[in-house]
Swiss-Prot record:
CDD domains tied to this protein: TIM
Intracellular or extracellular location(s): Cytoplasm
Any one Gene Ontology cellular component term annotated for this protein: cytosol
SUPFAM superfamilies: Triosephosphate isomerase (TIM)
Catalytic activity: D-glyceraldehyde 3-phosphate = dihydroxyacetone phosphate
Record carries keyword Isomerase: yes
Species of provenance: Fusobacterium nucleatum subsp. nucleatum (strain ATCC 25586 / DSM 15643 / BCRC 10681 / CIP 101130 / JCM 8532 / KCTC 2640 / LMG 13131 / VPI 4355)
Gene that this sequence comes from: tpiA
Record-given protein name: Triosephosphate isomerase
Length: 251
């Protein structure tokens, strides 16, 4: 039985004071949650205090990016070791916004995945297709490429520690929505690709999150699908009460 992992992605929102306030509320709200792993992805400037606030709770902290070197002359970058040293548990990688705005390639994302695993943290690898891919019938082709190139050369053991987050980029901010059944169909295809790479036993243990505008109103229907093992939540994670409603749907 796979355990649900529900992660919030705060993106470039919240200063340190706001982050501390929201996490304090979330920690209090979720103290009795037993069946869901809770993660918050916060901006770099908030991470150190975020880790301290949630210590001893069932909330873990994720970084939203990393550079795939332990140290060096890489001005402006943050290394996996720096994140690990302050107590970060997860790192969100390959998000559609980073692929779009910063032109991150699957090869570069794969380097980050390996660097995060090597230091003992858990990667959340984001994959997803655009509207033109969806309408052109290329969904599986695009996702399979992102998975195969993003997770190339991983051992089965490391694959099991890796979370895959499916973001239907075509459904974010376009007014188009994926039904729970459509999301399930794609998640099943993703698991089949993972099974090709790592074997069915490993694929059946891997967490596949849904990242297509999960909200309190649709969370229960999405999380009840067989191959949806949690969510990567954007806007609805910015307020503790709305994020908690999603967590309750999974719990």
């Amino acid at each position: 039985m796979r355990r649900l992992v529900i992660a919030g992605n705060w993106k470039m929102y919240k200063n340190n004071k706001e982050a501390v306030e929201t996490l304090t509320q979330l920690k209090d709200l979720t103290r009795d949650v037993k069946n869901v792993d809770i993660v918050i992805g916060a901006p770099f400037t908030c991470l150190s205090d975020a880790v301290k606030i949630v210590e001893g709770s069932n909330v873990k902290i994720a970084a939203e990016n990393v550079y795939p070197k332990i140290e060096g002359a890489y001005t402006g970058e943050v290394s996996p070791k720096m994140l690990k040293d302050i107590g970060v548990t997860y790192v969100i990688l390959g998000h559609s916004e980073r692929r779009e705005y910063f032109k991150e390639s699957d090869e570069f994302i794969n380097q980050k995945v390996k660097a995060v695993l090597e230091i003992g943290m858990k990667p959340i690898l984001c994959i997803g297709e655009k509207l033109e891919d969806r309408e052109g019938g290329k969904t599986l082709e695009v996702l399979a490429k992102q998975i195969k190139e993003g997770l190339v050369d991983l051992s089965k053991e490391d694959a099991e520690k890796t979370i895959v987050a499916y973001e239907p980029v075509w459904a974010i901010g376009t007014g188009k929505t994926a039904t729970p059944e459509m999301a399930q169909e794609t998640h099943k295809e993703i698991r089949n690709v993972l099974a090709e790479m790592f074997g069915k036993d490993v694929a059946d243990k891997m967490i596949i999150q849904y990242g297509g505008s999960m909200k309190p109103e649709n969370a229960k229907d999405l999380l009840s699908q067989e191959d949806i093992d949690g969510g990567l939540v954007g806007g609805a994670s910015l307020k503790a009460d709305s994020f908690f409603e999603i967590i309750k749907a999974g719990n």
